[in-house]
Amino acid sequence: MSSSEEVSWISWFCGLRGNEFFCEVDEDYIQDKFNLTGLNEQVPHYRQALDMILDLEPDEELEDNPNQSDLIEQAAEMLYGLIHARYILTNRGIAQMLEKYQQGDFGYCPRVYCENQPMLPIGLSDIPGEAMVKLYCPKCMDVYTPKSSRHHHTDGAYFGTGFPHMLFMVHPEYRPKRPANQFVPRLYGFKIHPMAYQLQLQAASNFKSPVKTMR
Protein backbone atom coordinates (compact mmCIF):
# COMPACT_ATOMS: atom_id res chain seq x y z
CA MET A 1 0.00 0.00 0.00
CA SER A 2 1.36 3.42 -0.89
CA SER A 3 1.35 6.35 1.51
CA SER A 4 -0.78 8.32 -0.98
CA GLU A 5 -3.78 6.05 -0.42
CA GLU A 6 -6.31 7.45 1.98
CA VAL A 7 -7.80 4.11 2.98
CA SER A 8 -6.22 2.50 6.03
CA TRP A 9 -4.66 -0.97 5.91
CA ILE A 10 -7.45 -2.26 8.16
CA SER A 11 -10.18 -0.93 5.87
CA TRP A 12 -8.35 -2.27 2.83
CA PHE A 13 -7.99 -5.74 4.38
CA CYS A 14 -11.62 -5.95 5.52
CA GLY A 15 -12.73 -4.83 2.07
CA LEU A 16 -10.97 -7.66 0.26
CA ARG A 17 -13.11 -10.30 -1.42
CA GLY A 18 -13.46 -13.18 1.03
CA ASN A 19 -12.88 -11.03 4.13
CA GLU A 20 -16.50 -9.94 4.52
CA PHE A 21 -16.82 -11.74 7.87
CA PHE A 22 -14.21 -9.48 9.51
CA CYS A 23 -15.05 -6.24 11.28
CA GLU A 24 -12.67 -3.29 11.51
CA VAL A 25 -10.73 -3.44 14.77
CA ASP A 26 -10.32 -0.05 16.44
CA GLU A 27 -6.72 1.18 16.20
CA ASP A 28 -6.86 2.22 19.86
CA TYR A 29 -7.39 -1.43 20.76
CA ILE A 30 -4.40 -2.51 18.65
CA GLN A 31 -2.16 0.19 20.10
CA ASP A 32 -2.79 -1.09 23.63
CA LYS A 33 0.07 -3.58 24.15
CA PHE A 34 -1.92 -5.43 26.81
CA ASN A 35 -4.38 -6.58 24.16
CA LEU A 36 -1.56 -8.10 22.10
CA THR A 37 0.05 -10.11 24.88
CA GLY A 38 1.68 -13.27 23.56
CA LEU A 39 1.03 -12.60 19.88
CA ASN A 40 4.68 -11.72 19.23
CA GLU A 41 5.47 -15.39 19.91
CA GLN A 42 2.91 -16.63 17.37
CA VAL A 43 3.47 -14.28 14.45
CA PRO A 44 6.73 -14.02 12.46
CA HIS A 45 7.99 -10.52 11.64
CA TYR A 46 5.74 -9.30 14.44
CA ARG A 47 7.01 -5.72 14.70
CA GLN A 48 6.95 -5.07 10.96
CA ALA A 49 3.51 -6.69 10.66
CA LEU A 50 2.14 -4.50 13.44
CA ASP A 51 3.58 -1.39 11.80
CA MET A 52 1.89 -2.35 8.54
CA ILE A 53 -1.50 -2.80 10.23
CA LEU A 54 -1.17 0.62 11.87
CA ASP A 55 -0.01 2.28 8.62
CA LEU A 56 3.38 3.25 10.03
CA GLU A 57 6.24 3.92 7.62
CA PRO A 58 8.08 0.69 6.72
CA ASP A 59 11.83 0.29 6.91
CA GLU A 60 13.75 1.31 3.79
CA GLU A 61 15.18 -2.21 3.52
CA LEU A 62 11.65 -3.60 3.37
CA GLU A 63 10.64 -1.28 0.54
CA ASP A 64 13.68 -2.39 -1.49
CA ASN A 65 12.98 -6.11 -0.97
CA PRO A 66 9.67 -7.24 -2.56
CA ASN A 67 10.06 -10.84 -1.34
CA GLN A 68 10.40 -9.67 2.25
CA SER A 69 7.45 -7.34 1.74
CA ASP A 70 5.24 -10.30 0.78
CA LEU A 71 6.24 -12.14 3.95
CA ILE A 72 5.40 -9.10 6.06
CA GLU A 73 2.02 -8.83 4.31
CA GLN A 74 1.22 -12.45 5.17
CA ALA A 75 2.34 -11.90 8.75
CA ALA A 76 0.18 -8.77 9.00
CA GLU A 77 -2.89 -10.69 7.85
CA MET A 78 -2.23 -13.42 10.43
CA LEU A 79 -1.60 -10.89 13.19
CA TYR A 80 -4.76 -8.97 12.35
CA GLY A 81 -6.76 -12.19 12.38
CA LEU A 82 -5.52 -13.14 15.85
CA ILE A 83 -6.16 -9.61 17.14
CA HIS A 84 -9.63 -9.79 15.58
CA ALA A 85 -10.44 -12.99 17.49
CA ARG A 86 -9.75 -11.16 20.76
CA TYR A 87 -11.42 -7.92 19.75
CA ILE A 88 -14.79 -9.49 18.90
CA LEU A 89 -15.05 -10.72 22.50
CA THR A 90 -15.05 -7.11 23.75
CA ASN A 91 -18.18 -4.97 24.02
CA ARG A 92 -17.14 -2.80 21.08
CA GLY A 93 -16.27 -5.78 18.90
CA ILE A 94 -19.48 -7.58 19.79
CA ALA A 95 -21.49 -4.48 18.86
CA GLN A 96 -19.85 -4.35 15.42
CA MET A 97 -20.38 -8.04 14.76
CA LEU A 98 -23.95 -7.86 16.06
CA GLU A 99 -24.72 -5.22 13.45
CA LYS A 100 -23.33 -7.46 10.71
CA TYR A 101 -25.32 -10.40 12.12
CA GLN A 102 -28.56 -8.40 12.01
CA GLN A 103 -27.85 -7.43 8.40
CA GLY A 104 -27.32 -11.07 7.45
CA ASP A 105 -23.71 -10.46 6.40
CA PHE A 106 -22.70 -13.94 7.54
CA GLY A 107 -25.43 -15.77 5.67
CA TYR A 108 -28.49 -17.74 6.73
CA CYS A 109 -28.99 -21.25 8.07
CA PRO A 110 -29.67 -23.75 5.25
CA ARG A 111 -31.88 -25.86 7.53
CA VAL A 112 -35.50 -25.56 6.34
CA TYR A 113 -37.08 -25.33 9.80
CA CYS A 114 -34.67 -22.59 10.90
CA GLU A 115 -36.51 -20.30 8.49
CA ASN A 116 -33.56 -18.24 7.21
CA GLN A 117 -32.07 -17.69 10.65
CA PRO A 118 -28.96 -15.45 10.42
CA MET A 119 -25.72 -17.18 11.41
CA LEU A 120 -22.45 -16.17 13.06
CA PRO A 121 -18.85 -17.09 12.19
CA ILE A 122 -17.11 -19.56 14.49
CA GLY A 123 -13.83 -21.42 14.63
CA LEU A 124 -13.57 -25.12 15.41
CA SER A 125 -10.09 -24.46 16.84
CA ASP A 126 -8.32 -21.48 18.38
CA ILE A 127 -5.02 -22.57 16.83
CA PRO A 128 -4.24 -21.01 13.42
CA GLY A 129 -4.03 -23.44 10.53
CA GLU A 130 -6.14 -26.20 12.06
CA ALA A 131 -9.61 -25.45 10.66
CA MET A 132 -11.28 -22.96 8.36
CA VAL A 133 -14.13 -20.72 9.52
CA LYS A 134 -17.59 -22.24 9.89
CA LEU A 135 -21.01 -20.69 10.50
CA TYR A 136 -23.00 -21.27 13.68
CA CYS A 137 -26.79 -21.20 13.70
CA PRO A 138 -28.09 -20.07 17.11
CA LYS A 139 -31.48 -21.61 16.40
CA CYS A 140 -30.57 -25.24 15.68
CA MET A 141 -27.17 -24.78 17.39
CA ASP A 142 -25.28 -26.57 14.64
CA VAL A 143 -22.39 -25.49 12.42
CA TYR A 144 -22.21 -25.28 8.64
CA THR A 145 -19.65 -24.65 5.92
CA PRO A 146 -20.01 -21.16 4.39
CA LYS A 147 -21.99 -21.22 1.17
CA SER A 148 -19.53 -19.16 -0.85
CA SER A 149 -16.20 -20.75 -1.72
CA ARG A 150 -14.45 -17.42 -1.18
CA HIS A 151 -14.84 -17.96 2.56
CA HIS A 152 -13.45 -21.51 2.52
CA HIS A 153 -9.88 -20.27 3.02
CA THR A 154 -10.51 -18.01 6.02
CA ASP A 155 -8.91 -19.36 9.19
CA GLY A 156 -11.40 -20.19 11.92
CA ALA A 157 -8.93 -19.12 14.61
CA TYR A 158 -9.49 -15.52 13.51
CA PHE A 159 -13.00 -15.77 15.01
CA GLY A 160 -12.41 -18.26 17.80
CA THR A 161 -14.43 -21.07 19.29
CA GLY A 162 -16.35 -18.95 21.78
CA PHE A 163 -17.46 -15.85 19.90
CA PRO A 164 -21.16 -16.69 19.23
CA HIS A 165 -21.65 -17.84 22.81
CA MET A 166 -20.10 -14.66 24.20
CA LEU A 167 -22.35 -12.55 21.98
CA PHE A 168 -25.50 -14.18 23.33
CA MET A 169 -24.23 -14.01 26.91
CA VAL A 170 -23.84 -10.25 26.51
CA HIS A 171 -27.05 -9.87 24.48
CA PRO A 172 -29.42 -12.70 25.48
CA GLU A 173 -32.29 -10.77 23.92
CA TYR A 174 -30.95 -11.70 20.48
CA ARG A 175 -30.91 -15.44 21.16
CA PRO A 176 -33.61 -16.99 18.91
CA LYS A 177 -36.03 -19.62 20.16
CA ARG A 178 -35.36 -23.24 19.28
CA PRO A 179 -37.14 -24.46 16.11
CA ALA A 180 -40.79 -25.34 16.71
CA ASN A 181 -40.78 -28.01 14.00
CA GLN A 182 -38.54 -30.94 13.25
CA PHE A 183 -38.47 -33.05 10.12
CA VAL A 184 -40.19 -36.43 10.54
CA PRO A 185 -39.38 -39.10 7.91
CA ARG A 186 -42.50 -40.74 6.44
CA LEU A 187 -43.24 -43.49 3.95
CA TYR A 188 -46.69 -43.66 2.36
CA GLY A 189 -47.80 -41.11 4.94
CA PHE A 190 -46.69 -43.15 7.97
CA LYS A 191 -43.87 -42.28 10.35
CA ILE A 192 -40.88 -44.58 10.03
CA HIS A 193 -40.29 -46.54 13.24
CA PRO A 194 -36.81 -46.09 14.78
CA MET A 195 -36.35 -49.87 14.66
CA ALA A 196 -36.35 -49.64 10.86
CA TYR A 197 -33.06 -47.72 10.92
CA GLN A 198 -31.44 -50.37 13.12
CA LEU A 199 -32.57 -53.09 10.73
CA GLN A 200 -31.17 -51.12 7.79
CA LEU A 201 -27.80 -50.73 9.51
CA GLN A 202 -27.68 -54.45 10.29
CA ALA A 203 -28.54 -55.29 6.70
CA ALA A 204 -25.87 -52.90 5.43
CA SER A 205 -23.21 -54.44 7.68
CA ASN A 206 -24.03 -57.90 6.30
CA PHE A 207 -24.10 -56.74 2.71
CA LYS A 208 -21.15 -57.82 0.59
CA SER A 209 -20.17 -55.93 -2.52
CA PRO A 210 -20.28 -58.04 -5.70
CA VAL A 211 -16.91 -59.31 -6.87
CA LYS A 212 -15.66 -57.34 -9.87
CA THR A 213 -14.64 -59.53 -12.78
CA MET A 214 -11.39 -58.85 -14.56
CA ARG A 215 -11.71 -57.97 -18.22
Curated annotation (Swiss-Prot):
Gene3D superfamilies for the chain: 2.20.25.20, protein kinase ck2 holoenzyme, chain C, domain 1
Gene Ontology MF: a single term: metal ion binding
Gene Ontology biological process terms, A to Z: Wnt signaling pathway
The gene coding this protein: csnk2b
Keywords attached to this entry: Metal-binding, Nucleus, Phosphoprotein, Wnt signaling pathway, Zinc
Localization per Swiss-Prot or TrEMBL: Nucleus
Comment on protein domains: The KSSR motif is part of a protein interaction pocket that mediates interaction with cellular and viral proteins.
Modified residues (Phosphoserine): S2
UniProt cross-references to SUPFAM superfamilies, sorted A to Z: Casein kinase II beta subunit (SSF57798)
Protein name as catalogued: Casein kinase II subunit beta
Family: Belongs to the casein kinase 2 subunit beta family.
Post-translational modification (record): Phosphorylated by alpha subunit.
